[in-house]
Amino acid sequence: GPFDKEIDKQVVAIEQNGEKEATEKTGRSGCLPWIGEGWYRTIITIPEGYSNGELIFDGAMAEPHVWVNGEDVGYWAYGYNVFALDITHATGGCKPGKHAVAVHLQNVEESSRWYPGAGIYRPVRLVLHKEKYIKTWSNFARTMMVGGIASDHATAAEARLRVSCEAVVSKHDGMSVTQTLRDASNNIVAQETHYLSDSKTTDITLAVKNAELWSPEHPYLYTLVTELKEGGKTWDVVEAKVGVRDISYSAEGFKLNGEARKFKGVCLHHDLGPLGAAFNKAAFRRQISILKDMGCDAIRTSHNVPAPWQLEICDEMGMMVMAESFDMWKYPKCKNGYARFFEQVDTESVNRDGKPWWERDITNLVLTTRNHACNIMYSIGNEIPEQSSAEGLKYSKLMQELIHRLDGTRPCTQGMDKAEGAMWSGVWQEMDVPGFNYRVHLYDKGYKNSAKGYVLGSETASTVSSRGVYKFPVEENHGKQYSDGQVSSYDLTACWWSNLPDDDWMWQDKMPWVIGEFVWTGFDYLGEPTPYDEYWPSRSSYFGIYDLAGLPKDRAYLYRVHWRPEAKTLHVLPHWTWKGREGEVTPVFVYTSYPEAELFINGKSQGRLKKMDVSMADFLENRVEERLPWGEMGKFADP
């Protein structure tokens, strides 16, 4: 590949990793050629009959600046966000014919902690409107009530769906909005019409009988059709896939459709491994399919606004989503990161609106994700340095309040790695969902310092391994390095700030007030090669449960055993080709959903091991959960 250790070489101390002195980091952002400037040019064709137009970018890396027919139509700072630009004036009121579009992008060094990609890596849409139309992103469908939920939590006797939208019209007289809900067989199950009066907005409640409820196990989607009419003339039609489902967070935990459950989630970076950062539907579907087979039911879009296609696929396939926004606010984690823009008010761009970038980005995040059934929570930040300060509390309140105004149906969280500082500043208590990044030893303190009645493992584990690589002696360690730049796949290596999966599971399973976890990470990703941040040519992560190609590491079977105990899982490690280890003891681990296992080597039994349930006190002394080990690690098992 086009890897070069000089690309974005950074001499820095990674503060969130606890580093005090700056050292050379060659692989932090993937060593791929993403830095520089680029231009895109294309021709669009506008047919007759339209008077208003927009270009909608699902994301462009980075700082996209757009011209149409040589006229500046706008700029956006954040390369991960969705944004819309009005091109009506630049196209002469949507004059029929061909129009030239030019897009300038730039990526500067030290602007990312991982590989961000470069260029137009998500779709761009041309959206055309007639004289009167439904305002883009104004349609908002939310489940207001679900009654008579069946025992399987897949259906309900009745549900109410509230739908609001805003029409762009010069006069209200005679204008109406019809909301129609169709089932998967295209049958009309609910329909209501409201006439516009003094307002351009409508609020319509649809009553749905015998409703099919959306969940990861039953990802049922309806089609919502919004029509703007004037007499017998239809001005605009907007369609959206929506799910009917009920979510709640309380001292009784997280409930979906009335059923308490814990998130079995993973964090995902936006790249697709060897395919890079350009979004690919088939590749993402494959990722979701792989994760679901492991028992995963949720993803966290770490640490950025998700691609709209991600949410569409998660709706269809049944995967809950924590929709994240930022990796930093005012205080930079890297020299030229988003902190350059966070508080900045754009005073120059033609699409400026007088608001700081954080507010514009949060607004677009909510408006573009709130109709998706899979979206069950927003995250306003990851390991934000300000979390321990009064300033952090101020911005936490501002962002959470903004989200509540735009979408009062979902809670907010942020991943807090300095939890004690966040408890001191009040940020911990402020968030709808208090989120721990690691720090399992503080879970009890966090629970007692919040009136919410629950805590979330917003980021957990950070166990590292290389697929198919085994190191000796086999021992639990934190960040141990080897001369070949690999990490042992015995699944006993965590980072200095983190822990093994077993530690998380004990809290998840034993404490009803822990509502789930999001493991770092589901798949390996480009950049951030901890624990080999200073080792060339290491340039991609070791955190993944699956590797860059989506192939399972041993940990995938460990998580499958824990998250899908009803499935039949039996996995033995390591491989058994050990030239040079003749006569030495080679530990064997078995990950299985069965209650016990017997190991045979060349037909000779090595003994039978049985799982056992343990108390928290016993666990802290001697972990016994999903692993059945033979050999020198036998102290971890119940013989």
Language model features: what each stretch is:
Residues 53, 157-165, 584-588:
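Structural beta-strand segments of beta-rich domains
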Residues 40-42, 81-85, 200-206, 622-626, ...:
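Short strand-edge motifs at loop-to-beta-strand transitions and within beta-strands
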Residues 1-30, 78-79, 89-161, 169-175, ...:
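An acidic-aromatic loop/edge-strand motif
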Residues 71-72, 110, 123, 131, ...:
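Extended substrate-binding grooves/exosites of carbohydrate-active enzymes
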Residues 16-19, 30-137, 168-171, 184-185, ...:
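Accessory beta-strand-rich segments of carbohydrate-active enzymes
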Residues 37, 96-97, 158, 197-201, ...:
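Solvent-exposed, conformationally flexible loop/turn segments
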Residues 67, 182, 227-229, 255, ...:
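Core beta-strand residues in small-molecule sensory/regulatory alpha/beta domains
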Residues 92-96, 164-248:
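Extended acidic/polar, glycine-enriched regions
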